[in-house]
Amino acid sequence: MSVSSVRVQVGGPHVFYSHKVMDRLVLSTARLMVREMSPSDLLPLAAILQDDGVMYAYGGAFSAAETEAWLDKQLRRYAELGFGLWAVCLNDTGEMIGQCGITMQEYNDLTVPEIGYLFARGHWHNGYAAEAAMACRCYGMAILHFNRLYSIIRITNVASQKVAFRIGMRPEDTIVRHYRGQYMRHIVFSAGID
């Protein structure tokens, strides 16, 4: 078994740990565990991705096939890059309540690291998205050595914009993306090494 531990501290009381245990990345916060997904996460993932309310920023709920493809894409990202969107679970119960992580996205003819997050509706307004996103921001800068991280958020998704502000990101641009047959305006948020 390969075990290593890295302690990453961000200003204030926030301390996050990353562990690599048997090649499965884990980030821990006070209330959350952020881990790689596996095929056994398909059902809790489907509960999130197939909810119209959660997925409005993506143009609506995913089908079963789109959900499976989404999970497969994350598993490929882990294998190819060592990161992607991870499962976010409650420390006390182990319940998967959302996803958060870092993916590579196209922006202004560049490929940039983006922090993304999606949470089950029953777990909104608890600060979980900001807690997980801050852990991912720390990981992206301290462990993956990105100098700048982005969040590209649909202009109508005010809740996600608030999360970006809470983790220290600021708007830098507005773009239009074509996704699932729709043109959608997005705000590009970013944060660099402080």
Walk through the language-model features, giving the residues of each.
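Conserved GNAT-fold acetyl-CoA-binding loop/helix
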Residues: G53-K73, G84
